[in-house]
Regions:
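Short, well-structured hydrophobic secondary-structure segments
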Residues: 45-51
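Alpha-helix boundary/capping detector
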Residues: 30, 39-43, 75, 92, ...
Length: 167
């Protein structure tokens, strides 16, 4: 589980991550995104999305189911089809006392192709940082910062349990 504090409101970050149609606008690896089913009402429900990605010489497509729960500030993504044998990720957004957000992000994946798996394993940490960085940069464009730049959120870390990494 990657855990970080971002100086944006949890509702704004939930909105950003749930806005999958705009991923190609700010995540350079995603070249296209198409929502094939949308059963979301008032931030609750699920949608299916087909993504096209490109990294160096690799071009792939995959489909995921995105489950949104705005009241809980939770997003879960599960794999439907494509080059993986598994893909899942979770986002949890926790409000801190100054209005900023403690973000918990967890991802698990495995490619069917062992060469692709080996390539991604070598850069796993870098890939996660890239993804988080893309969302953080887009949040900076869309939303104004909240909270204190030097907030000590040590106590909040004790109060907010780390989500389990099992799917």
């Amino acid at each position: 589980v990657e855990r970080m504090r971002l100086r944006y409101r949890p509702e704004d970050l939930f909105e950003l991550v749930s806005d999958v149609r705009r991923y190609p606008d700010f995540i350079k690896l995603i070249t296209a995104m198409r929502v094939t089913r949308d059963a979301v009402v008032d931030g609750v429900g699920e949608l299916d999305a087909e993504a096209r990605v490109r990294y160096k010489f690799v071009r792939e497509g995959f489909t995921t189911r995105v489950m949104l729960d705005a009241p809980s500030l939770a997003i879960d993504v599960t794999y439907l089809s494509g080059p993986f044998h598994e893909l899942a990720n979770r986002w949890r957004f926790h409000r801190l006392e100054d209005g900023s957000t403690l973000v918990d992000f967890w991802i698990r994946y495995g490619f069917k192709n062992p060469v692709l798996q080996m390539m991604l394993d070598g850069g796993r940490t870098r890939a996660i940082r890239y993804l988080i960085g893309a969302f953080e940069a887009e949040a900076a464009k869309r939303f104004g910062p909240v909270g204190e730049s030097d907030l000590d959120y040590t106590e909040a870390l004790k109060r907010i349990p780390t989500p389990e990494a099992s799917a």
